Design a protein with these regions (language model features):
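Hydrophobic alpha-helical transmembrane segments of multi-pass small-molecule transporters/permeases
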Residues: 10-17, 42-47, 83-94, 153, ...
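Extracellular loop-to-transmembrane helix junctions
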Residues: 31-56, 82
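Membrane-interface "cap" regions at the ends of multi-pass membrane proteins
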Residues: 1-25, 51-58, 62, 66-74, ...
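Central hydrophobic cores of alpha-helical transmembrane segments in multi-pass inner-membrane proteins
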Residues: 22, 46-58, 62, 68-69, ...
Length: 259
């Protein structure tokens, strides 16, 4: 792969690593629940904290050209604990996404009959996760989720077992599918009844909301999580970018545009 293609590929991988629930679900939730002007404190949080930390992580990975544990150990031996904490963060996050992936696997098999068409929420809690009534009934066990979760971890294992090379190949398949599905959801949502009213409610400005402390806390928290920081992801991508790769310009544009 040529230098220009490698540069583009690392850039796309960084975007793919950052795009997630923080961008698709949490940002619209905050914007709707607080104010349509939520993007103002969010952009400030990105400029003040998010983008500088993104550049720092990418630059560290590019300079040391090591995995995140060895990278911090190169600074100080006992700093390796920071790297291990980032690995642990990634494992916790991946454990969450593995469960979500398990739900998707279940719905792939049951989608042909549209068994949830009458009451989607009831079907999910009763048939899929088989939720209990409380902690007193904690002994309930969902066999479909358990089997799907094992399958999800097997998919993750085969996805990453050969390292970065395997991830690149899988990315070339999964990322276009993701973009296509997002476009489909966007077009479908605009075709729903009262879609424009929903867009207005989502973007409705409220100046008073900007003076609430909680909206600023949410903005800075979202700026950190939505860019995929503190998980060792950007350190790794930086180490794959090569010494001649310019960290600043491209990744600032990527960080701002994907949000």
């Amino acid at each position: 792969m040529g230098a220009n293609n490698s540069r583009l590929f690392v850039l796309l991988l960084s975007v793919a690593a950052a795009v997630g629930i923080g961008n698709i679900w949490i940002y619209p939730y905050y914007s709707f629940s607080h104010t349509g002007l939520f993007f103002i404190p969010y952009l400030i949080a990105l400029i003040v904290l998010g983008i500088p930390l993104l550049m720092l992580e990418l630059s560290m990975g590019q300079y040391f050209n090591k995995n995140v544990v060895d990278l911090f150990a190169s600074i100080r031996k006992w700093f390796s604990g920071i790297g291990w904490l980032m690995v642990f963060n990634s494992f916790i996050l991946m454990s969450f996404y593995a469960v979500v992936l398990a739900w998707h696997i279940i719905y792939i098999f049951v989608s042909f009959g549209l068994q949830w068409k009458n009451d989607a929420s009831k079907y999910f809690f009763t048939n899929v996760v088989q939720a209990s009534g409380g902690f007193n009934e904690f002994a309930n066990f969902s066999l479909p989720v358990f089997i799907a979760l094992i399958l999800a971890w097997l998919i993750i294992f085969f996805y990453i077992r050969k390292g970065f090379a395997a991830i690149k190949k899988a990315f070339l398949i999964t990322f276009p599918i993701f973009v296509f599905l997002m476009l489909m959801f966007f077009v479908y949502s605009l075709s729903l009844e009262n879609a424009l009213q929903g867009v207005y409610a989502f973007l409705k400005p409220g100046l008073r909301g900007l003076f609430k402390g909680e909206i600023w806390l949410a903005s800075f928290a979202l700026a950190l999580t939505s860019l995929g920081l503190s998980f060792g992801i950007m350190h790794t991508l930086g180490s794959k970018s090569g010494k001649g790769f310019l960290v600043g310009g491209d990744f600032i544009c990527a960080g701002e545009k994907l949000n």
